[in-house]
Amino acid sequence: MFRKLSSNSAWLIAFFACFAVYLSIACYPFVLSNNQNEPLTLLQGYYLVSTQYGWLGLIALPFMLLSLLLSFLPTRAFKGIVIAIAICLLIMFKVDILVFQQYKLHINALLIRMFFEGGGDVFDISWMSWLIFVSEVAVLVIGLVCTVWVSNKLAQSRAKFVLISVWFAVLLSTQMIHAYKNALYDDEVSQFSNNWPLYYPLTARKFIYKHDLVDENIASKNRVELTNIERSSLNYPLAPIQVQSKEKQPNVLFILVDAWRYSDATPEVMPNVSKFAEKTVNFTQHMSGGNSTQAGIFSLFYSLPATYWESFYASQRSPVFMDTLQAEGYRMGIFGSAPLTSPPLSRTVFKKVSDLTLKQTGETAVERDQQITDKFIEFQKQDSDKPYFGFLFYDAAHGTVFPELEFAKFKPYWERVDHILLNNDFDASLYHNRYKNSLYYIDSLIGDVLKNVDLDNTIVVISSDHGEEFNDHKMNYWGHTGNYSDVQVHVPLYVYMPNRQPEQINYRTTHFDVVPTMMNTLFDVQGTTSSYSVGHNLFDSSAPRDWYIAGSYYNYALVGKELMLVVNPGGHSQQLNRQLKVEKEQKVPVDIIRHSLDEMSRFYKKG
């Protein structure tokens, strides 16, 4: 028995060493999937080839390790099972390559669902396509036979350990290269991150800066200096945006409160904002493009689904809206309470903003919120013949902190937040009251801001990146990023425009709609909104908004008014109703899935 285990294990090690090499060759289209406008550098070439070898081998590794559990089987049976697993992996990678070449998306639950439920309505696969696919798989199997033959030769040789060592060293080197380049704000290699399925490369900026391996000040300068480098497979915008400023250029001020749930936008909790709201257009059914800061801010400024985040982050591509404001001479006043590096808004939304303050000096969110308020008030007082774009992002509600002597309005409240105590039986009102106290504090700061703003010449947008849940569904969801229910994605939106009458709008709107509205309000834009956005004008009541795409850090959802389809990594999806219960009676229409797929792939280069 021991001899059989030893023999099978030795062969499996040799097979994995050879199979990793074979996978990297068989899946060569992954390496070629970027539309590169410039010749590859030597480092880029090494990174592409080495990541192909290292990462695909790493994906195969768990399957090989699980096979060890069967090493007690007779040799032929054991090898047969391992080879069958390898064939399945090859087919999986082949299908993923075909999907990626078509949609610039790797296989996910949405595509699988479309295939089985949409059938020929979505995927038009001819018999010739099937024949070509089967033929290509047959060729891959022939190559696998050669791999098995080499493995048999190496099974009793120490060369297999050399190959394994080389594979591990190559994998490690690619991750170290990515971490180092990422710390430098250099997208030389990170732009290729979307090439491979399940690829999440290593980042270690805090460690690198802490140990002085890279000078953080120099790195932050690179963030601006790399502005004009164009290296990505994005096709954004779809056509050049040409604008002409209108006769009067108003200032624009975005005030965002992190984690502000719609139900707490009340006169009791937010008296200053509520009073100001009487002068605004109040969008009562406004939805964020995500349940996280990253997704919410991305959807607001880019007017695109958060599924594009990784590509924009890797290529450090700033949004059309910010580019246009800067090109038209707007001064930038960007004031974030939380660091603008987490999530990395400094490398995306505000990529081209010079002299950007990445982090405020305050120790607490209370101090930092006060700091950004004071800094903005000073900024907008500066004499200038040019308009400004202001961005204020308050953080106290996210951390549920506030000056307790002055702003403890809602009692009793949780005196110290200890997340480990949260469960279905916890009294949510204690936590919620603490949260409302922090909103009450933020409201006082927003009140100070609004007193100092020239409302005769300033457009003011007040909203949030996402909502906040306090176990509303009795399913132990607390905070955000947990689901796509209204309490986590429904946010306030108040838009103040000089000379526009206040009103309340009750149809659904989304974060995707804000930028198209601003662009057409501020400028005469040549071209269509769809060339840079999936949104519509906020004031267009006829625009289709029954479904929209909401994102998070790890999954996304197609959100309707009564139904949502949540798509998770690894091929699992769920249909839920608004109460987050599994919905089996209704189904998301195939045309909605098809349209959503187009929205998630439209801004990638084809071919």
Identify the function of each model-found stretch.
Residues M1-Y199:
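Transmembrane and membrane-interface helices of multi-pass
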Residues S6, A10-F16, S71, T75, ...:
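Membrane-interface soluble catalytic domains
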Residues L56, K94, L98, T307, ...:
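Phosphate/oxyanion-binding loops and surfaces in catalytic or ligand/nucleic-acid-binding neighborhoods
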Residues V170-H419, G535:
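Active-site-proximal alpha/beta segments of enzymes that process anionic O-linked groups
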Residues L198, S220-K221, D374-K381, E415-T458:
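A long, amphipathic alpha-helix that forms part
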Residues D258, L300, L325, L392, ...:
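Generic structural signal for small/hydrophobic residues in well-ordered secondary structure
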Residues F312-R317, S429-Y441, N483-V489, R500-M518, ...:
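A short beta-strand-to-alpha-helix junction
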Residues D454-N499, R545:
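Histidine-centered active-site microenvironments of extracellular/periplasmic hydrolases
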